[in-house]
Every structure is written in C-alpha cells, then in structure tokens.
Amino acid sequence: MAYPVQLGFQDAASPIMEELLYFHDHTLMIVFLISSLVLYIISLMLTTKLMHTSTMDAQEVETVWTILPAIILILIALPSLRILYMMDEITTPSLTLKTMGHQWYWSYEYTDYEDLSFDSYMVPSSDLKPGELRLLEVDNRIVLPTELSIRMLISSEDVLHSWAVPSLGVKTDAIPGRLNQATLMTSRPGIYYGQCSEICGANHSFMPIVLELVPLKHFEEWLLSMF
C-alpha cells in the first residue's frame, strides 16, 4: 500500500507489477542518460566560443543521430510489447469475478457460485474503527485466493469508471455496454487498496476498492460463511 510522502511505486504484489517496475527503471535510465547528454551538449554550446564556419554538412553525424534514436526506441518498444502481451494473456482461470461500476459504488458477483454477489460502499469517516484508513475502507471486501489465476470481468451500469489496484498492476476501464477483462494472480497474502481512476461524477473520490487475498483454505472457509 502507499505511505505518506511516498515518491515511488507501491510494492509489487503480482508478477505483472514486478515487470512494470523493471520496465519503468529500464526506461527511466534511458531517459536519464539522454537528458544528461543533452545538458552536456547545451553547456558546451554556452561555454565555448569556437565555431566551425566552413562546415556545411556532416553526413556522419546525421547518420549517427538518425540510427541511434531508432535503436533507443527499439530498446524501449520491445520490453513494452512483451509486457503488453503478458497483460493480455488469458490462461484458464480458476475463478471469475464480475465487477460492475455504479455512481458511486462497486458491485461484485462470483460467477462460479450461485447467488454470491454483494455491493461495496465506502465506509464514512464517522464509522471508521481505529486503524482503518479514511476514504479507503469499504463495508464489503473482495476476498480472493492467492496463487490462482483469477479472471476479472469489468463493466459499468451508468458512466465510465476505472477499476484500479496499483499494487497488483491492474487498471481496467469499466465502460457501459462493454465487458473488459483482466487477470489477477499473486503469491503474497494481504489487503490491497485501490480506487476508481476515471472521473465519474461528484463522488468519484469515494469509490474505494479493497481486496483481501488469502490462502485457498481460508478462501473456502469464507465461501462457506457466505451461504
């Protein structure tokens, strides 16, 4: 989860998020090197008084500054495409969770089980218990098993929403009349927080998401308690 005055990403809790963090560091290093080179060239231009008045063209330099950016773009594009394909890859899911966005709450349906669905509203600040997080707690948490592939089906009943959980590297738009799909998998039990990430009206800021990821045995016990 996030911490006060945090500048970096949240800790990765899924393989996809780990790949995204590696790609971010890879791209940031390239940007840093290019920025340093540009600043160095600018500083040379500002501090030197030498000028090559007889130089009309420099084909070697033009060749280098055409080929080098192309190579850099390829070094950025290939890892990016790899992660995009990983995010869209759908294996045989062990569980399917249907998510519907509303103004301004979420509803969830475990489609593999009959009559297992509920709405999830934000807990008002006046009802929070000690240790609970303001604007992030909900009355009904999503409970999911760890180490299993979970398919998320995401849509909306009214306007555009976006179902996002940063620690899991998931952000999928909820669009009325359209069913989007995402895959979740994590080996780390815990409670993970997210929020609606698409401006959807007056109470957009009050649509938190809470996932409680537990071992399979505890998930089965939770299922029995829901019937």
Curated annotation (Swiss-Prot):
InterPro entries on file: CcO_II, CcO_II-like_C, CcO_II_C, Copper_CuA, Cupredoxin, Cyt_c_oxidase_su2, Cyt_c_oxidase_su2_TM_dom, Cyt_c_oxidase_su2_TM_sf
Residues annotated as binding Cu cation A2: C196, E198, C200, H204
Cofactors named for this entry: Cu cation
MF annotations from Gene Ontology: copper ion binding; cytochrome-c oxidase activity
Enzyme Commission numbers on file: 7.1.1.9
Cofactor annotation remark: Binds a dinuclear copper A center per subunit.
Binding-site residues, Mg(2+): E198
Membrane-spanning segments: 15-45, 60-87
Mitochondrial intermembrane-side positions: 1-14, 88-227
Protein name stated in the entry: Cytochrome c oxidase subunit 2
Source organism: Propithecus tattersalli
Species classification: Eukaryota, Metazoa, Chordata, Craniata, Vertebrata
